Amino acid sequence: MSIDADPTRRFPPGAKMEMALQASTSSPNRVRQVGAVLVASDGTQIAACNTFPAGVEDNEERHAGDGRFVWMEHAERHAIFEAARRGVATAGAHVTTTFFPCIDCARAIVDSGVACLDTPAPAFDDPVWGRSFERSQVILREGGVVIRIVDAGDAAPDGERGD
């Protein structure tokens, strides 16, 4: 198996956004539901959402205040970790996500060998994630990940979103 030298060729922009949007609807996060799809070089597709790690209890206390930041895994890392659990190689993979990656997810995307990322534009004015997006954009670019900006709303039928 070889890694495609042009990771953008395999998927037109937004090809997996509908799948990522569908995955986001499974998120227990009460503030923001995020979905991600990782497509490995061998064609394996892994859809994930921001959620509690496997076996970790979902209870009220863990949703309170900043609890979701402590207890929940982000969709991008959830997809990467699921690939690792299944023994799916991520070198040269393509990731589509419904929300621009944070710093931690950007590092995971780079270090797992993801080659291309389809994502909505970063909301630099977001009060929680804006500053993180500035840094994650640098990490992704310097890490060699091709970033393609996709409007998540365009993928949903009739312009409706699942979050």
Predicted regions and their residues:
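Zinc-dependent deaminase catalytic domain
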Residues: 1-163
